């Protein structure tokens, strides 16, 4: 895609631009904030950051062919034949989003975009909506923590550690969806992505939105629960189309805030018949869940190959969204639930023939813990052994809560790294341990920062009938430390630990 710089700038808010040095009559072919991704005639945005400053990479970007630099401070040296656009620090991300949206011809306006937000369940709801729409024969694309599909029909793993990528990537991906004749685009819309500080999603035109729940997460970024809530409410307030609507979890304490933020909405509940869709019965088995729900006085019977009442919530959100967006008969969508399958890293069972069970899950918040641990305890025929950590440089207050919940349900706990980042691993582990009051260190509570060794320890402790749960990493392919990222595969780590245990038992 090629455009004239002046044609893009003419459509942008001129108040955001402080100064332009150089020609506007340049041809540009791409937009990026990463010097690693720069190609000839790319616009390079020098974003200020926590660890790195994009201004330090301007010369690298120019050497690789960038002919337009967007910066927030004056340069000591200006390269000839390069145009410099100066904006405020505070506005540079907003300007990048505006610019990307215009450069890619406002792709979200050519799609019906579905946004899913909430503390827990976002990725699963996105995936279930994706599967149901595909089952209905609809051309669909999506962006989530785990997978991307730009409409070419194949899933690729999310190449970023961000659930919601930067605006340059969002609009490029939406543009590819338009090229692939996608009708519906599903975006996992995180609070980080919705926040005006990152401005990743401010230029996305949403048609329908889903709210799953609000829990204790990301307060290190938002500061207060109210700021966190407001970021998510922004998604609902952005639905401008008169035909647009929201799907809301009636059981969440903040339900009314979301209902008031959108003109039209549908609610679901596992507790109250006042909701538009009320789940009246749930029967959980180890490999499936049967449930019944009412809508407008009609009773529906559903069965899915997933475990847990929390998954019933996620299924209901997806079912309602798809039935309403397609104006389909409810029973028709219920019949399609056979296509629903678990997302990678969500309630993944690892069975190599061992006499105990192992489950891997991405759960990393107190809300997710409070939903999953009762299920784990119920299906553990003997002891429950949990392995988990908590993210470094993230919400500190949740660590105590994670430990407290795990302590109630677990017989043995092994604490380890999740993503320590710049924090000391043992400091994080000891923060979690403050919530664990019913265990004794080195008897039924173990501090092993190295996640591989921690999993090996948990597996070595397992007896017949035990359930070992490894939480917090799920699908993720790395563990982040201060100065490095360690490749990680939770499935492989668990499998190797089981195989090592079997080998050691043979040698006895």
From Swiss-Prot:
GO biological process, one term: cell division
UniProt similarity note: Belongs to the MurCDEF family. MurE subfamily.
GO CC annotation, single: cytoplasm
SUPFAM superfamilies with a match to the protein in the record: MurD-like peptide ligases, catalytic domain (SSF53623), MurD-like peptide ligases, peptide-binding domain (SSF53244), MurE/MurF N-terminal domain (SSF63418)
ATP-binding recorded as keyword: yes
Protein residues bound to ATP: 118-124
PANTHER family per UniProt: MUR LIGASE FAMILY MEMBER (PTHR23135), UDP-N-ACETYLMURAMOYL-L-ALANYL-D-GLUTAMATE--2,6-DIAMINOPIMELATE LIGASE MURE HOMOLOG, CHLOROPLASTIC (PTHR23135:SF4)
E.C. numbers: 6.3.2.-
Single GO term (MF): magnesium ion binding
Function: Catalyzes the addition of an amino acid to the nucleotide precursor UDP-N-acetylmuramoyl-L-alanyl-D-glutamate (UMAG) in the biosynthesis of bacterial cell-wall peptidoglycan.
Maturation and modification: Carboxylation is probably crucial for Mg(2+) binding and, consequently, for the gamma-phosphate positioning of ATP.
Lineage of source species: Bacteria, Pseudomonadati, Spirochaetota, Spirochaetia, Spirochaetales
Pathway terms, separated by semicolons: Cell wall biogenesis; peptidoglycan biosynthesis
Primary location recorded for the protein, binned into one broad class: cytoplasm
Binding site for UDP-N-acetyl-alpha-D-muramoyl-L-alanyl-D-glutamate: 35, 163-164, 190, 200
Gene3D superfamilies to which the protein is assigned, alphabetical: Mur ligase, C-terminal domain, Mur-like, catalytic domain, MurE/MurF, N-terminal domain
Domain of life: Bacteria
Residues modified to N6-carboxylysine: 232
Keywords carried by this UniProt record: ATP-binding, Cell cycle, Cell division, Cell shape, Cell wall biogenesis/degradation, Cytoplasm, Ligase, Nucleotide-binding, Peptidoglycan synthesis
Name of the molecule in the record: UDP-N-acetylmuramyl-tripeptide synthetase
InterPro entries linked: Mur-like_cat_sf (IPR036565), Mur_ligase_C (IPR004101), Mur_ligase_C_dom_sf (IPR036615), Mur_ligase_cen (IPR013221), Mur_ligase_N (IPR000713), MurE/MurF_N (IPR035911), UDP-N-AcMur-Glu-dNH2Pim_ligase (IPR005761)
KW Isomerase (keyword) present: no
Origin species: Borrelia garinii subsp. bavariensis (strain ATCC BAA-2496 / DSM 23469 / PBi)
Subcellular location: Cytoplasm
């Amino acid at each position: 895609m090629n455009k004239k710089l002046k044609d893009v700038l003419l459509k942008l808010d001129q108040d955001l631009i402080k100064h332009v040095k150089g020609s506007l009559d340049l041809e540009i072919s791409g937009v990026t904030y990463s010097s690693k991704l720069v190609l000839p005639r790319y616009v390079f945005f020098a974003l200020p950051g926590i660890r790195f400053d994009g201004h330090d990479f301007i010369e690298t970007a120019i050497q690789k062919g960038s002919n337009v630099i967007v910066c927030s401070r004056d340069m000591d040296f200006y390269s000839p034949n390069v145009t410099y656009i100066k904006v405020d620090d505070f506005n540079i991300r907003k300007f990048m989003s505006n610019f990307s949206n215009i450069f890619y011809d406002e792709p979200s306006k050519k799609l019906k975009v579905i946004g899913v937000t909430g503390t827990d369940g976002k990725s699963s709801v996105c995936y279930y909506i994706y599967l149901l729409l595909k089952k209905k024969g609809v051309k669909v694309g999506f962006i989530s923590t785990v997978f991307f599909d730009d409409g070419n029909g194949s899933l690729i793993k999310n190449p970023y550690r961000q659930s919601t990528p930067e605006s340059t990537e969002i609009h490029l991906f939406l543009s590819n969806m338009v090229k692939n004749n996608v009708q519906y685009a599903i975006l996992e819309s995180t609070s980080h992505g919705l926040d005006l500080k990152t401005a990743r999603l401010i230029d996305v035109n949403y048609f329908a939105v889903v709210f799953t729940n609000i829990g204790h997460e990301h307060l290190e970024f938002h500061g207060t629960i109210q700021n966190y809530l407001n970021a998510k409410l922004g998604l609902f307030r952005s639905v401008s189309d008169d035909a647009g609507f929201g799907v809301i979890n009636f059981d969440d304490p903040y339900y009314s805030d979301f209902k008031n933020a959108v003109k039209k909405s549908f609610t679901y509940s596992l507790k109250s018949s006042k909701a538009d869709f009320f789940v009246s019965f749930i029967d959980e088995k180890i490999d499936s869940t049967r449930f019944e729900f009412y809508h407008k006085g009609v009773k529906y019977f559903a069965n899915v190959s997933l475990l847990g009442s929390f998954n019933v919530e996620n299924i209901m959100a997806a079912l309602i969204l798809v039935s309403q967006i397609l104006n389909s008969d409810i029973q028709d969508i219920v019949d399609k639930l056979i296509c629903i399958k678990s997302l990678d890293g969500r309630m993944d069972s690892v069975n190599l023939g061992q006499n105990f069970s192992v489950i891997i899950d991405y759960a990393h918040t107190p809300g997710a813990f409070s939903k999953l641990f009762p299920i784990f305890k119920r299906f553990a025929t003997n002891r429950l052994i949990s392995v988990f950590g908590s993210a470094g440089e993230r919400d500190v207050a949740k660590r105590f809560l994670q430990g407290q919940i795990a302590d109630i349900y677990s017989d043995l706990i092994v604490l380890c790294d999740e993503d320590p980042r710049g924090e000391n691993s043992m400091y994080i582990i000891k923060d979690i341990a403050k919530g664990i009051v019913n265990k004794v260190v080195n008897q039924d509570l173990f501090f092993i920062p190295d996640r591989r060794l921690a999993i090996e320890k948990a597996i070595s402790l397992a007896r017949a009938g035990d359930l070992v749960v490894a939480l917090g990493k799920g699908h993720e392919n790395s563990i982040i430390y201060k100065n490095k990222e360690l490749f990680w595969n939770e499935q492989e780590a668990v499998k190797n630990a089981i195989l090592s245990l079997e080998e050691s038992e043979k040698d006895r």
